[in-house]
Regions:
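Short, acidic Ser/Thr/Gly-rich low-complexity loop/linker segments typical of extracellular
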Residues: 27-37
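Exposed, low-structure sequence patches enriched in small/polar residues
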Residues: 85-507
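A generic beta-sheet turn/junction motif
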Residues: 14, 23-25, 44-46, 350, ...
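Exposed aromatic-hydrophobic patches
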Residues: 37-43, 74, 149
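Short Pro-Gly-centered beta-turn/loop motif in secreted/extracellular proteins
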Residues: 13-17, 39-48, 65-67
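Conserved "repeat-terminator" motif of extracellular CCP/Sushi domains
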Residues: 74-83, 283
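Structural motif
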Residues: 2-17
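A short, solvent-exposed loop/turn motif at the edges and junctions
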Residues: 23-25, 47-64, 68-69, 79-82
């Protein structure tokens, strides 16, 4: 007999990957794949037996086979609330002495949820968010308030809309973004459920720092963002059409076409020299078309309402992309090419902890103005987060060929785990090392005709890489990490930050 079907989360109606499906008291069975599907054959003599479906964090399900054989099974797994009930019981015992901790925990959970249903949670068609980006603060905008809304599958299982509007009380400017998405597969709640197969139209007008953001990264930075971008950032508006597809085998690709306009912020200027005369551009307009290929073996997610959390973090992830673009200057169009290769891997070190490693190579093959060059913090953010350079200024190191390496160690059963209160709060050790090195080819050296003058704070790399390291602890209150960051090289640069305490959010 053929036994096949799907396993879904009963609360979110999302696939449950890597669940054990087997016939009771026999070794016959399989594990669901990364989209919750299973299929296996069993002897006809077992058709009256019981099918068992089990997975961590879910209650075990028992189904009579003879009631399921004539159709494809859909197994709904109820989340196992034992841990939640145990925590509530413990909180009730400690209510008199632990009210503050309980309140902090509830606030942290509220922030992590990130979205609020507009209306009845069982029937609402729109959600408000993101909580994590309202409000934020940065030196350019000062206090920034942002509010957004996104549709879900109750409005349409194929069409999705999302948008936000933000206002900076320091720069007194409105920012906004709108996105219309068509998913070629019907989705249970949001358009990003694995595997994606969607076409999107995007328009955005917001702050953009070339030295702190990858050109294709969403503007979702938290808390004290653009920390060293004052007078080194731009305002950017762009329109884009992109198509993204993910496959069950871990392969994914994105194609995009975009037209952007960059306007310098603060004292940043787009000045250049031509025939011994000085000129200034008020804006830089460019168009791009590109492709990104990603591969992650065994890619699978725990898919919740509006989030998807990767299950397998130890498989390496590879990125390869190429962009063809053109920028306009003196009413002439100049073509450029940009290539990127990135790899990231998590290593488990037994009870000691884990080590996250990320390596990147970027190359601009053509003559381009400095906003289109590469910088240390331009990176693909996937499973491994919170590894950004911290002490360098946004545009401090300019290059058209760049290599970066980032290593982060987080302890498990080390010193802090031996201290009862630290272990109870799950606070763990954190050590990291980051290095960046690059070169600037002759065609992009300062002083070349029709290239913008570099900002005064921009430098080429010398014979050594830029290196910084950190030591601290993470998982404070379940979402904060605190560390001391130290700068090892290029300490002679003007206004260089040599060391600083950093507080960051891990969500």
């Amino acid at each position: 007999i053929l036994i096949k079907g799907r396993v879904l989360d009963a609360e979110y109606l999302t696939p449950v990957p890597y669940a054990a499906v087997y016939i009771h008291n026999t070794p016959i069975g399989v594990v669901t794949d990364n989209v919750g599907e299973f299929s296996f054959e069993a002897p006809l003599s077992l058709k009256h037996e019981t099918l068992v479906v089990a997975r961590q964090k879910y209650e075990i399900q028992y189904l009579k086979l003879d009631e399921q054989l004539f159709s494809e099974m859909i197994v709904f797994m109820e989340p196992d609330n034992f841990a939640i009930r145990s925590k509530e019981f413990q909180d009730s015992l400690n209510a008199g002495s632990n009210k503050f901790a309980s309140t902090v925990s509830k606030v942290a959970d509220f922030i992590k949820d990130d979205w609020i249903p507009l209306g009845n949670p069982q029937t609402n068609k729109f959600d408000a968010g993101r909580i994590q980006t309202f409000p934020t603060y940065n030196p350019i905008e000062g206090l920034r308030l942002r509010a957004g809304v996104a549709s879900n599958s109750r409005l349409s299982t194929n069409f999705f809309m999302s948008s936000y509007v933000a206002y900076g009380f320091g720069d007194h400017r409105w920012k906004y973004r709108g996105e219309l998405t068509y998913s070629f597969d019907k989705k249970s709640y949001h358009e990003n459920k694995f595997p994606k197969n969607k076409l999107a139209l995007v328009y955005e007008n917001d702050l953009y720092s070339p030295g702190e953001m990858h050109p294709r990264s969403p503007n979702n930075l938290l808390l004290i963002t653009f920390r060293r971008s004052e007078n080194e950032a731009t305002y950017r508006n762009f329109a884009e059409v992109n198509y993204e597809r993910e496959y069950k085998n871990g392969l994914a690709h994105t194609f995009w076409v975009r037209r952007s306009r960059l306007t310098p912020q603060g004292s940043l200027r787009f000045d250049y020299q031509l025939d011994n005369m000085g000129f200034n551009d008020k804006e830089l307009v460019n168009s791009e078309a590109g492709v990104l290929v990603r591969y992650s073996f065994g890619e699978a997610y725990e898919q919740q309402k509006r989030r998807r959390k990767p299950i397998e973090l130890t498989s390496p992830v590879f990125f390869l992309s190429h962009t063809v673009g053109a920028y306009v200057q003196f009413d002439k169009s100049h073509t450029y090419h940009r290539s990127e290769l990135s790899a990231q891997k998590r290593f488990l070190l037994g009870n000691t902890g884990r080590l996250d490693a990320v390596g990147e190579v970027m190359k601009v093959w053509s003559r381009v103005p400095f906003p289109l060059l590469v910088y240390p913090n331009q990176r693909h953010r996937h499973h491994i987060e919170n590894n950004a350079f911290f002490l360098n200024r946004a545009l401090e190191f300019v290059a058209d060929e760049q290599y970066t390496f980032r290593f982060t160690f987080m302890g498990d059963d080390l010193l802090l785990a031996k201290i009862p209160i630290m272990n109870q709060l799950q606070i763990r050790e954190l050590i990291s090392l980051r290095a960046s090195y690059g070169r600037l080819s002759d065609i992009n050296l300062p002083g070349n005709a029709e290239l913008y003058d570099f900002p005064d704070i921009s430098f080429e790399y010398d014979s050594v890489p830029y290196v910084e390291g950190t030591i601290g602890f993470t998982n404070l209150l379940g979402l904060l990490r605190v560390e001391y960051v130290h700068r090892f090289t290029y300490r002679h640069h003007p206004d260089a930050l040599l060391g600083k305490i950093r507080v960051d959010v891990t969500l």
